[in-house]
Amino acid sequence: IGGAGYTAGELTRLLINHPEVEIGFIHSTSHAGQPVSAVHEGLLGDTDLCFAADFDLNAVDVLFLCQGHGKSTQFWAEHPLPDTLRVIDLAQDFRDESAGYVYGLPELQRQRISGARLVANPGCFATALQLSMLPLAAAGMLPDRISVSGVTGSTGAGVKPGSTTHFSWRSDNLSVYKPFNHQHLAEICRSLKGLQNGWDGVIDFVPVRGNFARGIYAMTWIHTDMTEEAARRLYTDFYATAPFTIVAPGEVDLKQAVNTNKAVIGITATEGRLLVTCAIDNLLKGASGQAVQNMNIMAGFDETAGLRLKPSAF
């Protein structure tokens, strides 16, 4: 539902090639009747599907909601939820786990996701920042104040054009937006508080608009006496069973993660400070790829099915 946006396009690309999936319909009110490849031009030659005006929720096993934030609540007010339907919502409406939804960050809640019918997919920045901090929270090592900055590509703003996504403005440019009050902070803090009992700290998060199309590069730093070796061991052990979260042996760059479902984490410690970097593709691990990962877990498929993607090296 909501098939014309960037996340829906990436979701379609992944599901077309998924070994266990047959797409029932791709709904779009604004593009009903048009070929999907006329909107998502990268799918030319890969699918003959057309956008549907109507749909039958009883005819599918899993529904992905790719509408704008706030529209999911309205959707369920207008459509009864079939008893057997599994739902993965990419909007932020139910990330607080209201209405029976489970928060869908596999590295945090894999077991709960496996038994869930309703999953709320995390936000893109929320994914990168949580993966940067979850091991510290699990070890009870989060300080009262955490400094974070992250640079995101223009696709994070969605498919609808705006003044800050216009090429002439975005190219060769950087700008801060929503400093200290980004909407993803709520879901990040909720997860951290659940892991580190009694933590009620502050995250000073400064998001930055980058002059590239896709990807997030997040930098989190705290004051701690932990050595780099100990920090690397902590993160490696925490993510030992996470197939897409990788602790890199050296420095991390964005191209290691873009076009994949990976979260690539870098660890640097010096003189009482720890820096954790995290690179993800905002449209994949930050959205559609993670949604497919959640579907795989919910359905009992191989968690990596349809997601074995290689980054572009150059």
List PLM regions with ranges.
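N-terminal Rossmann-like NAD(P) cofactor-binding subdomain of oxidoreductases
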Residues: 1-172, 177-179, 196-198, 266-270, ...
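Alpha-helical scaffold segments in soluble metabolic enzymes
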Residues: 10, 14, 131, 135, ...
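Short amphipathic alpha-helical segments
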Residues: 115, 216-218, 272-274
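Short Gly/Pro-enriched turn/cap motifs at secondary-structure boundaries
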Residues: 176-180, 208-210, 253-257
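C-terminal substrate-binding/catalytic lobe of Rossmann-fold NAD(P)-dependent dehydrogenases
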Residues: 181-247
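C-terminal active-site/capping subdomain that shapes the small-molecule cofactor and substrate pocket
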Residues: 221-314
